[in-house]
Swiss-Prot record:
InterPro entries: Dihydropteroate_synth-like_sf, Enolase-like_C_sf, IspG_bac, IspG_bac-typ, NO2/SO3_Rdtase_4Fe4S_sf. Its cofactor is [4Fe-4S] cluster. Its EC number is 1.17.7.3. GO terms for molecular function: 4 iron, 4 sulfur cluster binding; 4-hydroxy-3-methylbut-2-en-1-yl diphosphate synthase activity (ferredoxin); 4-hydroxy-3-methylbut-2-enyl-diphosphate synthase activity (flavodoxin); iron ion binding. Pathway: Isoprenoid biosynthesis; isopentenyl diphosphate biosynthesis via DXP pathway; isopentenyl diphosphate from 1-deoxy-D-xylulose 5-phosphate: step 5/6. Pfam families: GcpE. The keyword Nucleotide-binding does not apply. This is 4-hydroxy-3-methylbut-2-en-1-yl diphosphate synthase (flavodoxin). Binds 1 [4Fe-4S] cluster. The keyword Calcium does not apply. GO terms for biological process: isopentenyl diphosphate biosynthetic process, methylerythritol 4-phosphate pathway; terpenoid biosynthetic process.
Length: 359
């Protein structure tokens, strides 16, 4: 099996995919590429949240003409999403996109596919071979149905098309809307291909449903070392895709650059508005990109003991709460000042982090 540390290295601009334990985060704009200002606003928001790469759709000639404007002003490498029209892929490469996503089976002209491969080699641009369960070739559907086997054979077929034209700078995705089928496809893909794998559950759904389905389908793969880059596909603001990806990877020990706020589920001992406080702290730390675990607990009965794994935290009360570090109580504070004290401690930890890391 080719785990992420053993897959081939592919570079999207200066971003490495494969051959390492880092999972590259990406998302896709929902603005039309021709709407340059809106596209750039989304791209900047995504990068601020932690995206390494952003994909844009090239749907028509107006989008094609706008690519260079977007690429030239983007703070991260841009990926072009191409369907059917080979001229858009060629234009995207020439306009400075650092990666192309396409389905080689949708490019009817073999001469055009050859031209794309030659140009991508010239510009050192990788191509993601995107296999989707909804577009499995008819002959494979007829023989195998919508199965992981059909998807892998389709991917092998598309890879051969590219290699026939001397192109081997490849990333592969095997997307379905089923968590179980996705797991099967990617596990089989990790055995068959040494190319980096782009993980994702397509058409996953809205924020809650899509998050549940994506985490259910991708976590087992990530724990097995499968997957080099990831997009959490959600029917919501693209920034939420990066937030969910970071939280999921952080819970698996694969992403550190965030403040992890944990809180107890509460019980009858609760004497303050823990839900409100937790949301307030989550909002407070959302732009602080550094590793810290903050615990917010409902009472002092189990507080410090339950929070030993947290860096800092609080346990609230009716009139007074406690503040602790690494499970050790450091002070008692009137309840009305508890949240402000916690915020100050978080900022102090952030300043220490910046000083230690020369930021």
């Amino acid at each position: 099996m080719y785990t992420r540390t053993k897959t081939k290295k592919v570079f999207v601009g200066d971003v490495q995919i494969g051959g390492q334990n880092k999972i590259v985060l990406q998302s896709m704009t929902i603005a039309k590429t021709k709407h340059v200002k809106k596209s750039l606003k989304e791209i900047n928001d995504l990068v601020k949240e932690g995206a390494d790469l952003v994909r844009i759709a090239v749907f028509d000639d107006a989008d094609k003409r706008a690519i260079r404007k977007v690429v030239d002003q983007s703070p991260c490498p841009i990926i072009a999403d191409i369907h059917f029209n080979p001229d858009y892929a060629i234009a995207a490469i020439k306009a400075g996109c650092k990666k192309i996503r396409l389905n080689p089976g949708n490019i009817k002209s073999k001469e055009k596919l050859r031209e794309i491969c030659l140009l991508a080699n010239q510009y050192n641009i990788p191509i993601r071979v995107g296999v989707n369960s909804g577009s499995i070739p008819y002959d494979l559907m007829r023989e195998y149905g919508v199965t992981s086997t059909a998807m892998i054979i389709a991917a092998q077929r598309y890879v051969r098309m590219l290699k026939r034209f001397g192109f081997d700078n490849i990333v592969i995705s095997l997307k379905t809307s089923s968590a179980l089928l996705s797991m099967q496809a990617y596990e089989l893909g990790a055995k068959k291909f040494s190319y980096p794998l782009h993980l994702g559950i397509t058409e996953a759904g809205t924020l809650i449903n899509g998050t549940i389905k994506s985490v259910a389908g991708l976590t087992p793969l990530l724990l097995k070392g499968i997957g080099d880059t990831i997009r959490i596909s959600l029917s919501t603001n693209p920034v939420d895709e990066i937030k969910v990806a970071k939280k999921m990877l952080n819970s698996l020990g694969l992403y550190e650059n965030l403040v992890d706020v944990v809180a107890c589920p509460t019980c009858g001992r609760l004497n303050f508005d823990l839900f409100k406080v937790t949301k307030e702290i989550e909002e407070f730390v959302k732009d602080l990109h550094f590793p810290l675990k903050v615990s917010i607990l409902g009472c002092s009965v189990n507080g410090p003991g339950e929070a030993k794994e947290a860096d800092i935290g609080i346990a609230g009360g009716k009139q007074e709460g406690i503040i602790f570090k690494k499970g050790v109580v450091v002070k008692s504070v009137k309840q009305e000042y508890l949240v402000d004290e916690l915020k100050q401690m978080i900022l102090e930890e952030y300043e220490l982090f910046k000083k230690k890391n020369g930021k």
